[in-house]
Amino acid sequence: ARHTLNTAGQNTTSLRQRIPAGPNRILPPDGVAVGVLAARASLRGAWIAAANEPMKDVVALTPPIPASDWQALQDAQINLLRNDPRGFFALSADTLALDPELRLINVRRLLILLRRLALRRGTTYVFEPNGPVLRRSIQRGFDLLLTELFHRGAFAGATPAQAFRVVTDEGVNPRGSVDAGRLFVELRVAPSLPMRFIAVRLAQSGERLSVVEEL
């Protein structure tokens, strides 16, 4: 049978979990699912989904959900749990995002990672003179960072050139913007599944930093 974990946090089923040297407990599935997600992120990266990963110490799911409800639950972006001979698994890894390009949780987590990295690196550029030398330095730094993520499997593409681009040229930094003290860095990445590029733009204006995602 399949059961569900609502990605909005409203559980429609519970897990019965084995506790060493004690009685089994009935728990909502959220904690176990998040634990699987965290373990995969620690071992392989934030861009790895938790679907099809066995849940430890789970012995049952309750209550049963009729098979006739499965499709409606999937259409509502509710993640299904399944019991098979190998154990208990999450069959999907959806968020409640309305845009299908951002629906998968591993894509969302990859973009969160890139936002954090962009903001962290961006603080080192705040007091640098805004000119070609700075922009070349920024491009080299992000190229190295994204190349490392590419080799770890974060992006699609056979080569780094197919997987991402770091843009700091006049296309995103026109003269008027530079004269106004603004600096833009655009990271265009292809997450490691069939989908189009997503742009993460780091914007600096004076001492203020912001990050915007664009499809």
Regions found by a protein language model. Give the residues of each.
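Structured, hydrophobic secondary-structure cores that serve as assembly/anchoring elements
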Residues: 1-215
